[in-house]
Amino acid sequence: MVKKVFSFVWLITMAGTAAAEEAPDTIGRELDEVVVSGTAARQRLGDVRPGTERLELSTLKQLPSFGGENDIIRSLTLLPGVRSEGDGGGGFEVRGGSASQNLVLVDGITLYNPAHVMGIFSTFNDDALSSATLFKGAVPAMYGGASSSVLATQLAPGDMESYHGSFTVGLLAAKLKAEGPVVKDKLSFAVAARRSYVDAFLKMIPQYRSTVMNFYDVTARLRFIPSERNIVDGTFFISHDNMAVGNLMGMYWGNIGGSLNWLARSSDSFSVTSTLALTHFEPKMEMDIMDDDQVMRTYIHNYSLNERFRLALTDDHGLELGLRSELLRVRSAEWAQGASFEREIRSLWQNALWADYAGRFGEHFDVDLGVRLSVATVPTGRHFHDFHSNEGLQADFSGKTYFDVEPRAALKYALTSLHSIKAGVGMSTQNLHAIRSGMTSFPFDRYALTSASVKPEKSLQYSLGYAGMTYDGGFDWSAEVYYRDIDNVYDFKDGRSTFSDIMLENIILGGRGRSYGLELMARKNIGRLTGWISYTLSHTQTKIAGINDGRWYDATNDRRHDVTVTAIYRLSDSWSFSGSWIYLSGQPLTAPDVKYEIAGETCYYYSRRNAYLTPSTHRLDLSATYTHTGARFTYQWSFGLYNAYCRYNPTVVYFEDDPSKPSGTRAVQQSMYGLIPSVSYTLKF
């Protein structure tokens, strides 16, 4: 089943290519592009938390775009310790973690599988964003539920004084943005929408006229300022993908969410932020094979309430306290085939209290100390667990409560005004598990909630780093080492995959994981030519009793070497050029050791998990941008080459018979993208 799905994705994609917290008083900011040049060198040096990346706004096109889209996720992968899942995967992986171990937030709304059309675009419309911060090391105590990293993004509020807008038309998609006041200085709006039209090109090719591949997303934000000490924000987000080949197969998924945020200041030193948020993520797959209809559905429903209290004790010391209550309801699997119907739905209630203290002691020493107390309750009864199977299977729905204490700490010592040392330690707990059987994450991965038998995933990470810069900030550099130990990592049993059994506990096993590495980065910040070079050396392993004879084995997402080189050249006020080169060493792969025949069918025997490597991945992206700024209008032309030297990187590797080989078997690589040119036109008014 999984092989058919990957084959379908590869088919339609090849067809297509052939043809940190927003400042409360920030009002009316306009985003022209999100870039990962990082913060100013001085601010990077002064950040207390190691492994923190703040993505800045810029009015200049700087990084190569894909199809005319400046993508946050793709930009993140140019940083050390962060990498893409590869072609066909829309997620990002941080310090050996999988994409499902990241917490991705938009104005407090949790997003799942934040990707369009199998990773061609992310669900982030850059026109709508105001700011973004990635925590890959010491995560603040206010964030929980993710064992790897946190990406916190905020949408830009509408201008309270005047109306603005823009639209962009590219080869693959178009987008529109509008913002302005509803009631001047009191109520504003900002709306951004995007829609792809890959289908139009597919219909020009006779053999792909019945193929559907499109997506859309809409973001909207209202800001209301009833008084000088109160701000109320309402956010709405929806994204949806459609992929199908006639009546043979269809895949659909998307997020829909909303949040209401109220910031109240009782004084200049004390404020309270209340946030109510919800998310619905619902993938669906349909297949019609020889008149045999098959339907597979899953969903994740997330409802949360957050309270955050901030108190400035002095100019150099501050305290934050908060609480969070969250209800998760997950349909791990539901599929129907003919008269057969099976379904599994589970629920989990999470509550947390947290505290965070930040202080400065003299000119050299800064500290951030936090703790998070989390309680995960697995409720009992049919109201919280819905299980149905034609096979008459029974499940143990006994309840259980887990208590966890998650300490967090970050320290910075300034050796001089130009050099600093940072250290961090943090524990995180995750109760939503995604178990994948492919090389990348997938909208139809099996999701499991912590239960009486599936334990919470617990991560403990240590990090130590050094940062330095030149006196004028023209150059800065950093080095960081980390070690992460994880308990209760889950993987499929040998011979099992996503759709092997409706009862997830029957097909998975739990164990330990570990990841450690070195991250290096050097940047040039001044002059016509700017850019950065990053290198990551890392190793990620898993050890599970019952898999690989209980020995450590390389995790599916282990990539030993990761190199990125990014250059930006500003020829004039109108023209700028950029390029980025990315290299990733091979990905672990499970290959057969022996094959045999049963009733004329070839069967393979796998003795070791992930003992082989796929070929390495590398590509070069190039772009050129022309910008004209007028009195009332600004327009921009962007030209790009994705994968400029047309390297076919592996997306799926499988094995088949080949009598010409001494082993009688050969590995077959399928790739998604070759050289993809792009052009887009943007008008701002």
Question: Which residues make up each language-model segment?
Answer:
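Periplasmic N-terminal accessory/gating domains of Gram-negative outer-membrane beta-barrel systems
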Residues: D47-S100, V106-V139, A156
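Signature of Gram-negative outer-membrane beta-barrel scaffolds
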Residues: S325-S420, N431-L432, I547-G550
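A beta-strand signature from Gram-negative outer-membrane beta-barrel systems
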Residues: L78-L79, T123-S166, K175-K177, K186
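Outer membrane beta-barrel strand-and-loop segments of large Gram-negative receptors
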Residues: N302-N306, Q350-W354, L449-K455, Q461, ...
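Short, acidic, small-residue-rich periplasmic hinge/interaction motif at the N-terminus
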Residues: A20-Q62, A99, A479
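Surface-exposed extracellular loop regions of Gram-negative outer-membrane beta-barrel proteins
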Residues: E282, R329-E334, T377-S389, Y413, ...
